[in-house]
């Protein structure tokens, strides 16, 4: 079963997808956030049943305003594209992606997804 990670942004969002084995993540694409519901509907039609959404924490490790915004967006996405939605800490994902030569939103989503997959194997 393939899993897709979402690095949500106000203007654009990055997507990454796992391989069939659920061991490796790769960047998929970056889309305008306003088009994300349609994109997720298509992914669910293509057989994706789990979305992992990056949710940031504050420097104190707490969920702050940005996490609350993500939660609100996820509730909207659940209506548009019903599936299993889970959260993964996205702290540092953009910096880690850039350190590996990929400064795209999809690259950050790959970091989020790989962390999620690694924690479950």
Show where each model-derived region lies:
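Phosphate- and other anionic-substrate recognition elements at nucleic-acid/protein interfaces
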Residues: 2-3, 10-121
């Amino acid at each position: 079963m393939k899993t897709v990670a979402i690095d949500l942004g106000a203007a654009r969002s990055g997507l990454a997808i796992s391989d069939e084995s659920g061991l490796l993540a790769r960047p998929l694409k970056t889309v305008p956030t306003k088009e994300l519901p349609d994109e997720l509907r298509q992914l669910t039609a293509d057989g994706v049943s789990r979305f992992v959404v990056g949710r940031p924490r504050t420097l104190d490790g707490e969920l702050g305003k940005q996490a609350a915004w993500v939660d609100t967006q996820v509730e909207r996405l659940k209506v548009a594209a019903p599936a299993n939605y889970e959260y993964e800490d996205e702290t540092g994902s953009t910096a880690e992606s850039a350190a590996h030569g990929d400064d795209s939103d999809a690259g950050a989503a790959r970091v989020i997804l790989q962390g999620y997959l690694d924690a479950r194997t």
